[in-house]
Structures are given as structure tokens and as C-alpha cells.
Regions:
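Conserved beta-strand hairpin/beta-sheet module of binuclear metal-dependent hydrolase folds
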Residues: 1-51, 160-172
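Short glycine-/acidic-enriched loop or helix-start segments at secondary-structure transitions
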Residues: 20, 42-43, 72-74, 96-97, ...
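Residue-level marker for buried hydrophobic side chains located in beta-strands
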Residues: 31-33, 62, 85, 168-170, ...
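A general structural detector for well-ordered alpha-helical segments in enzyme core domains, enriched
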Residues: 47, 73, 198-201, 229
Length: 230
């Protein structure tokens, strides 16, 4: 765990394409954005305790999108904390187990990048443990201290979040810095045209810090770098 800005902490390591989760302290409450993998819940709880807090202080868990590396730890964390679970309504049916995630298919745009991940997921995938969504959120809503942006493209219900006081953007998988800096993972983006529109919208925020779904956060020249993706 590292502090990205006052009251903003980054969790995650090298697993799952260097997937990241973000823990916010605000108004005496904790908000978690994404939950890492199925067996990462204990690590998130340890991070909460290292802040001098208790699991019950986690009031809300917000999901950027319903892909395994971002919601895997949700069931364990919901059980341990009782936190309210929030996601976009399109993703809610996947999180709750009523519908499978939409696939890039057997003929993805970048097969040599996609197939190894698909094989790895197939060989190592535990069964998704469904968790009902407590509240659907969308564009213009608030999730604790965060402003919600609907940024479809990578998935239809993909959300990003903005913390105005630090000009901090959480892009989810709309932007990645691992294995390279790029507009998300193109091989896994379902609608490139929507994704391009979403990138333009995020670039207009002129964020000073960008926390991404996979890879290290962008802390220098963040606004210029995001504009360069548009």
C-alpha cells in the first residue's frame, strides 16, 4: 500500500497484470474502488487495519467494471465489512451472477495479446461468487467523496471517478500503464469508438494524478499524457 494523495491509498502488486485498487479516507469513512482478485480480500482488510481503522469503517465498495481482476475480492469484503456495493446498472447483473461478462470473442482485435490472458483465466478461474448490488450509480452521481463518470468502451457500464480536491482521476481500465502506457488494453476493449469518446471526456478534466486499473499511477504530467491519448 502506498499513499497517492492525502487520504488516497493504492493497493495491489504484480498479479493480474499489475491490477490496482484504491482506498479513500474521507469524512470519517472509507471507500474502496475495486477489490482485486478472489484471494486478495485479506490483504485489503490488512491495509484497512494498517490505517488504524477497522473493517466496519469501510462504508462503500465501488466497482469500475465487472471483470474478474476488479471484482474478485468483492464477496469476501462484503461479508467482512457489510459495506454498500455500488456499480453501474449494466455491470450489476454480472456482479450479481445473473449474466456472464461480455467477451471479446474468439477473434479479438489483438489475438497474440489476448489469447494468453484468456488461457490463463480459463486455467485459473475460480467460480465467481455473486454479490447483489446495493445501489446502481451512473454519470453525475456521487460515491462518497468521488464524482462518478460513465465512460463506456472497455465495457458498456465502465465507470471512472474524479476527486476534485486533488484533481485525481481513477480511469479504471480506460487507461493503462502496464505493460505500457496506452488507452486501456485495446485487445480487451469492446467498443473502440465509445472508448475514444470516453478518453476525450477524461482528458478534459486535466487531472493532476491518474490512477489506472493496471499499472502504476501517473503522477507527473498526467494531464498532458492523457491528452496525448486522444
Amino acid at each position: 500500500m502506498r499513499e497517492l494523495a492525502p487520504g488516497v491509498h493504492v493497493l495491489g502488486g504484480t498479479k493480474g497484470g499489475h491490477v490496482r485498487s484504491f482506498l479513500f479516507e474521507a469524512n470519517g469513512e472509507l471507500t474502496l474502488v475495486d477489490t482485486l482478485f478472489e484471494n486478495d480480500g485479506a490483504g485489503v482488510l490488512d491495509a484497512i487495519r494498517k490505517l488504524g481503522r477497522q473493517p466496519g469503517d469501510l462504508k462503500r465498495i465501488v466497482i469500475t467494471h465487472a471483470h474478474r481482476s476488479h471484482l474478485g475480492g468483492l464477496a469476501a469484503l462484503k461479508r467482512a465489512t457489510g459495506a454498500t456495493v455500488l456499480a453501474h446498472e449494466w455491470e450489476a447483473d454480472i456482479v450479481s451472477g445473473n449474466r456472464p461478462a461480455q467477451s471479446v470473442g474468439l477473434k479479438p482485435t489483438a489475438p497474440y495479446r489476448t489469447y494468453p490472458f484468456q488461457v490463463g483465466i480459463f486455467l485459473n478461474r475460480p467460480k465467481h461468487r455473486p454479490v447483489p448490488i446495493d445501489e446502481s450509480i451512473g454519470d453525475g452521481d456521487d460515491a462518497g467523496p468521488l464524482q462518478v463518470l460513465h465512460v463506456p468502451g472497455h465495457s458498456p457500464g465502465h465507470l471512472a471517478f474524479f476527486l476534485p480536491e486533488h484533481r485525481l482521476l481513477l480511469s479504471g481500465d480506460a487507461i493503462a500503464t502496464w505493460p505500457r502506457f496506452e488507452a486501456g488494453w485495446p485487445a480487451f476493449t469492446l467498443n473502440p469508438d465509445q472508448h475514444a469518446d470516453s478518453l476525450r471526456r477524461m482528458a478534459a478534466l486535466d487531472a493532476a494524478i491518474v490512477g489506472v486499473g493496471h499499472g502504476d499511477p501517473i503522477t507527473e504530467n498526467a494531464a498532458d499524457r492523457v491528452h496525448g491519448l486522444v
